[in-house]
Amino acid sequence: MKGKVYLVGAGPGDYKLLTLKGLECIKKADVIVYDRLANKNYLKEAKENCEFIYVGKASSNHTLPQDDINRVIADKAKEGKIVTRLKGGDPYVFGRGGEEGELLKEEGIEFEVVPGITSAIGGLCYAGIPITHRDYASSFHVITGHLRDDDKENPEINWNALANTNGTLVFLMGVANLQKISSNLIKEGKSKDTPVALISWATRSNQRVITSTLENVYETAVRENVKPPTLIAVGDVVELRDKLNFFESKPLFGKNVIVTRSRTQSSSLVSKISDLGGNPIEVPTIKIEKIENNIALE
């Protein structure tokens, strides 16, 4: 039996932002290879004997190099298994899904790609920031925040073009290089007063949004101790946040709620807590069993 690989975008974090097809791929997987930003609650949807392999990457702390991740995925598929590669966001938006797909093609392994909601769009939405708006931005640009460690210019990033566009700029994985990003944009002509939003843990109950200006954003981030994962949104659309911020106004936003019901009974309550902006934590303390041979109850 030949194996198959599904490269699945897990969305930006909110449990309910996974696609139906993505959920199907999780449920039928023999092996799930998942990263740091994929919501771990999705693993509860897997079948009982599913194998879980964590390959998460944090800043300067990678569980496995990308080549080794590619090898794990391919080898498991060659064993005849259905492999679901679960990635935060979308596999093809700085998710290195293209590299994984190339290897699978080269080795004759069947694969499919299941798109996911990228945090560049979904994350801004949950922060009350539309990535485009008729009166503010008619385009958007998603840019990697990983810059070179030396002082040389990144040949793949045209700072002059970015600084002189009226579109929204979204930098992913850029907190460590925030000072370089802001200074490069200002150097190439972007107004120092351009609004900027820093969105940490976007779409989750612990989402945190800090706004500033291009000139002051680095100092603001240092003062507020902003850490990855954080999106950097640059543009006038940030000004709409106060009007369009629906998520953080939910009654349970920012609260952890422990659910002690048995797992078979907790799903509806967990869903309601999530809908109200809370973070449900399932800690079953109740187990329902059939009563047998209890004379006291006869």
Residue spans for each PLM region:
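Short hydrophobic/aromatic-enriched beta-strand-loop microsegments
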Residues: 50-57, 108-112, 131-138, 189-198, ...
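Short gly/pro/ser/thr-enriched loop/turn and capping motifs at secondary-structure boundaries
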Residues: 40-41, 59-61, 118-122, 139-142, ...
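A contiguous loop/helix-start segment that scaffolds small-molecule binding in enzyme catalytic cores
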Residues: 2-7, 78-83, 139, 144-263, ...
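N-terminal basic/disordered segments at the start of proteins
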Residues: 24, 31-39, 258-272
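Class I SAM-dependent methyltransferase SAM-binding "motif I" and its flanking Rossmann-like core
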Residues: 14, 88-165, 210
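A cross-family signal for N-terminal binding/gating loops and helix N-caps
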Residues: 259-298
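Class I S-adenosyl-L-methionine
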Residues: 1-15, 20-117, 121-122, 223, ...
